[in-house]
């Protein structure tokens, strides 16, 4: 379950930010996850709650938005699905989006 390593990374960064702001509590965290990372949002929610236990982020709301993959044929420009790496025209796919994992915002109480 690679969701736990992502949850731990979120918590590390959130706690670093909260410490810089001298926060007492973290109330919410928002992340954007690329669909090509194959992260299950429900599992990430669970792992976040486990990883945040005993920290000032315990009980914080985790908002997850999934970024759709942007995959296009290099020859004809047709949009392809994440399961297509070769277009009907014979062109190969170029992946431009859906691979990122971004911590978008952290809300804290000082």
From Swiss-Prot:
Zn(2+) binds at residues 73, 76, 87, 89. GO terms for molecular function: nickel cation binding; zinc ion binding. GO terms for biological process: protein maturation; protein modification process. Ni(2+) binds at residue 2. InterPro entries: Hydgase_Ni_incorp_HypA/HybF_CS, HypA/HybF. The keyword Iron-sulfur does not apply. Pfam families: HypA (PF01155). Belongs to the HypA/HybF family. This is Hydrogenase maturation factor HypA. It comes from Archaeoglobus fulgidus (strain ATCC 49558 / DSM 4304 / JCM 9628 / NBRC 100126 / VC-16). The gene is hypA.
């Amino acid at each position: 379950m690679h969701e736990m390593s992502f949850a731990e990374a979120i918590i590390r960064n959130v706690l670093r930010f909260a410490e810089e702001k001298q926060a007492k509590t973290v109330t919410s965290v928002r992340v954007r996850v690329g669909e090509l990372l194959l992260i299950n949002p429900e599992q990430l929610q669970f792992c976040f709650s486990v990883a945040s236990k005993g920290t000032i982020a315990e009980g914080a709301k985790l908002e997850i938005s999934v970024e759709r993959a942007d995959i296009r044929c290099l020859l004809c420009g047709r949009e392809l699905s994440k399961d297509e790496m070769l277009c009907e025209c014979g062109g190969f796919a170029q992946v431009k989006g859906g691979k990122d994992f971004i911590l978008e915002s952290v809300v804290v109480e000082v």
